[in-house]
Structure formats: C-alpha cells, structure tokens
C-alpha cells in the first residue's frame, strides 16, 4: 500500500477543521484503510490526485459523470451560463426546459420539482406521499439508502454499512429519535412474501413504499421482476404511493431509467446525479394529482433557495442531450458488461472466489461465490479480500469505490483501451488477495 505524501498532508490538515477530514464519510477510506486520495483534477475516464498520480476512475463522482469528466460541451454550457450570474432565486426558462425534458424521457412523471440533493428529493417525496394519503407508515428495504433524512436512517446502505449496526431495526445513526423511525417498516430486499405479509397486516396504514429498483448502496443488487410487479400491485390495491428512488439509476441504466427496464410505472420518482451533470441537482416528480399537493398549490410544503440553480440546470440539460444520442446506453451497457465479465474471468484464472454483475452503466463486484440477491447475501462477501484488491488496484492506477458495499460506474469515455489497462492491473491485484 503506497502513501501519497501530498494527500496524506492534506488529510492531516483537513482533520483539524473538517470532522474526520472529509465532507462525506465514505471518502475517508475508513472501510478500506489507508489515506484517501485528494483529487486535483479530472478529464474523461481519469482522475489526478494532489500528488499528480493518474487513476482510471470507476467512481465517477458516485454516478453523475456518465459522459466522462469535464466533457467539453458540458463545461462550455456551464461557462456560458455563469457569465450571466450563478443564481437568481427566481424562475428561469432553463428550469422549465429541464422539467419538460424529464417529463418527456420518463413517462410516469407528469410534473416534477427540482431540488439540490438526492436527500431533499426522497425526503420531499415521502412528505408528499404522507400528505397525499393521510397516512404515516413508510416501507423501505434492508440495505437501500435514500439519503440521510431521519426516517430513512434504519438498516440503510452506503456509508452506514461501514459505520453503523445494521442488524437491528433501530436508527442507524445517533441523533435519530426512536419515535421517528417507528413509522418506518424495514423489509428484506427482493422478499415478495414479506412484502405481501406487510400489506396484509398494515395495508391501510402504509403511505408509501420507497425502493431502489436496482440497489446501488449495498453494492449492486438487482430487484427481481416479481419483486417490482408485487410492489406495484400491492400499492395500487391498498392506495399506497410507490416511490422509485432513481437518484443513482436514473438515466444511467437506461434513458427511461430503471422503470423503463422493468416496465413499471411508479407513482413518484426521485432523480439526481446524472440530471446535474456533476453539479448539485436532483428532482422528484410523478402523477399530477399527487404533485398537486405541493405548495404553492397544496398543503405539503417544500422549498429551496438553490432549487433549479442555473449552472446545475445547464450541466444537466447538456448531459441529458448527450446521453439521448442513438445507441448511447447500448454502448455503455456493453462496455460495462465487458468490464465485469473480464474481471470475473481473470478471478477464475487466479482461483479467487469472485462474482460480478452490471445493469446499464452500473456494476458490482463481490468477493464471494455467486451474485447476491439480498442484503443478507451481500454482507457475506469477503470484505478483507475486497480491501486488499482495492489497494492493489489503487497502487496500479485504478480508482474503485472505497467500500465493498458501493456500486461502481462506467462512463462513455471508458473505451476498450481503458478496459485493457484495468484488466492488466486486475491480473496483478487478484494475485495479491
């Protein structure tokens, strides 16, 4: 494990003024150990750290950089808008265009509200679902992460899998009252029987079911077709709101999002990451009758100073235009599948227990036999082997997510030459674990 001197110095300095030295916990490398890399710049599929070391990037800012870092057209769009000021706190034509584009690409969304983060989107969608139904109970699933709103921090994924006890049906974070999470029911992901039982017992109390249609915050776990069909049918039958959290999957796994892949029409959808093109942006939207409950029309309050920020909208609109090109997502899915198949083949050659999967431009790697289908199966992966693999790849210039419980991301700039370089590094890394 190498020690980057400049990043090490910055990390030590940062810890004096920033809790833990980072502004989001997973960045601290607590799960994998070692010194987090402080990034200086990025372009295409590459990152450069503060020491000048170049890495092939499979994090992509946790998903937004679907067309690669610093795409010239995205950069130009932001620069042009920035010349007219960064924010107005008033409506703009561009945010209307963004809303129209989202509604065109995602047929289940009849109206949409722009916000600044995925947490805002999910938090607001839940408040809206409760206001619309007049009910309090929320159903979520083990290992799914929907931002850090209090009511959703129970058996949650992402960084909480490193820092919290996820074995108990209790808040995953201190500072969250038990009285808040008592309105949150947590079920096993992909467990149709448990879902049906929950509705049989509590159907008249359930305001909403919120789900990552393809989980990406406990590593990548596909939702089964049966699971999605059951959620849709049960929510319809009992008058609950089905919320697809597509902050991660939205526009990344397909142009119409994961709901297009599964043929499911949720009542509300949460979006983020790609729609900001790397800038802070998110959204929630869905059925017109539900969205009509939002202020200023209705009684469900939601607001944000930077919602619809002009720079974020410019980056997002340009990114959406680029990914709407014919064949974009087919090519992205092909490259991502090449990546996981190639890694799996190398692991077999070396004799390391390993599995990998991908959906669109997302992928998961697991140090275990077989692709997991649930949170329980994910937690049986060999974290020690992943950590060793992570550092062996990092030392050879490949930047993976610094946690065994996070999905990875491929951009349109990850061509065959990039994959070949990744495979060359992987051959050495698998031998090190």
UniProtKB/Swiss-Prot annotation:
Protein's pathway: Porphyrin-containing compound metabolism; protoporphyrin-IX biosynthesis; 5-aminolevulinate from L-glutamyl-tRNA(Glu): step 2/2
Gene3D superfamilies documented for this protein: Aspartate Aminotransferase, domain 1 (3.90.1150.10), Type I PLP-dependent aspartate aminotransferase-like (Major domain) (3.40.640.10)
Q: Name one GO molecular function term.
A: pyridoxal phosphate binding
- Can you tell me which family this protein belongs to? Belongs to the class-III pyridoxal-phosphate-dependent aminotransferase family. HemL subfamily.
- For this UniProt entry, what is the primary localization, expressed as one broad class? cytoplasm
On this chain, the residues bearing N6-(pyridoxal phosphate)lysine are: 273
Q: Which domain of life is it from?
A: Bacteria
Q: What protein name applies here? A: Glutamate-1-semialdehyde 2,1-aminomutase
Query: Could you tell me which InterPro entries the record lists for this protein?
Result: 4pyrrol_synth_GluAld_NH2Trfase, Aminotrans_3, Aminotrans_3_PPA_site, PyrdxlP-dep_Trfase, PyrdxlP-dep_Trfase_major, PyrdxlP-dep_Trfase_small
Question: Which terms are listed as keywords in the entry?
Answer: Cytoplasm, Isomerase, Porphyrin biosynthesis, Pyridoxal phosphate
GO BP: any one term: protoporphyrinogen IX biosynthetic process
Q: Which cofactor does it need?
A: pyridoxal 5'-phosphate
Reaction(s) this enzyme catalyzes, per UniProt: (S)-4-amino-5-oxopentanoate = 5-aminolevulinate
Pfam families in alphabetical order: Aminotran_3
Recorded source organism is: Ralstonia pickettii (strain 12J)
Question: Which EC numbers does the record give?
Answer: 5.4.3.8
Q: Where in the cell is it found?
A: Cytoplasm
Subunit comment? Homodimer.
The terms describing its cellular component in GO are: cytoplasm
């Amino acid at each position: 494990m190498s020690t980057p001197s400049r990043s090490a110095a910055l990390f030590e300095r940062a810890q004096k003024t920033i809790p833990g030295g980072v502004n989001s916990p997973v960045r601290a490398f607590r799960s994998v150990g070692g010194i987090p890399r402080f990034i200086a710049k990025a372009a295409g599929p590459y990152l450069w750290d503060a020491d000048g070391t170049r890495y092939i990037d499979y994090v992509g800012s946790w998903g937004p950089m679907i067309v690669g870092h610093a795409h010239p057209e995205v950069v130009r769009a932001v620069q042009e808008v920035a010349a007219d000021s960064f924010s107005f706190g008033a409506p703009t034509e561009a945010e209307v265009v963004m809303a129209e584009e989202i509604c065109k690409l995602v047929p289940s969304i009849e109206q949409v509200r722009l916000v600044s983060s995925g947490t805002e989107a999910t938090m607001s969608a839940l408040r809206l679902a409760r206001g619309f139904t007049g009910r309090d109970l929320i159903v979520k699933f083990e290992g799914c992460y929907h931002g850090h709103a209090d009511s959703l921090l129970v058996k949650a994924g992402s960084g909480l899998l490193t820092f919290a006890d996820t074995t108990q049906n209790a808040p995953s974070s201190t500072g969250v009252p038990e009285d808040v999470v008592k309105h949150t029911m947590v079920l096993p992901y992909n467990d149709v029987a448990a879902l049906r039982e929950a509705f049989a017992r509590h159907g008249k109390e359930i305001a909403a079911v919120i789900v990552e249609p393809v989980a990406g915050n406990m590593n990548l776990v596909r939702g089964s077709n049966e699971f999605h069909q059951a959620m849709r049918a049960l929510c319809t039958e009992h008058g609950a709101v089905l919320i697809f959290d597509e902050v991660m999957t939205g526009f990344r796994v397909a142009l119409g999002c994961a709901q297009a892949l599964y043929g499911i029409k949720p009542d509300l959808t949460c979006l983020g990451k790609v729609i900001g093109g790397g800038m802070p942006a998110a959204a929630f939207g869905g059925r017109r009758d539900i969205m009509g409950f939002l202020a200023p029309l209705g009684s469900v309050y939601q607001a944000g100073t930077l919602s619809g920020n002009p720079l974020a909208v410019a980056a997002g609109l340009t990114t959406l235009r680029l990914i709407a090109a014919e064949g974009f997502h087919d090519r992205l899915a092909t490259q991502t599948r090449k990546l996981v198949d190639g890694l799996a083949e190398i692991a077999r050659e070396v004799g390391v227990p390993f599995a990998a999967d991908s959906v669109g431009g997302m992928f998961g790697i697991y140090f275990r036999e077989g692709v997991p289908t649930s949170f329980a199966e994910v937690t049986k992966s060999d974290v020690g082997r992943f950590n060793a693999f992570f550092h062996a790849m990092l030392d050879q210039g490949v930047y993976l997510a610094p946690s065994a419980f996070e999905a990875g991301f491929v951009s349109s700039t990850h061509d065959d030459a990039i994959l070949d370089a990744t495979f060359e590094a992987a051959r050495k890394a698998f031998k090190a674990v």
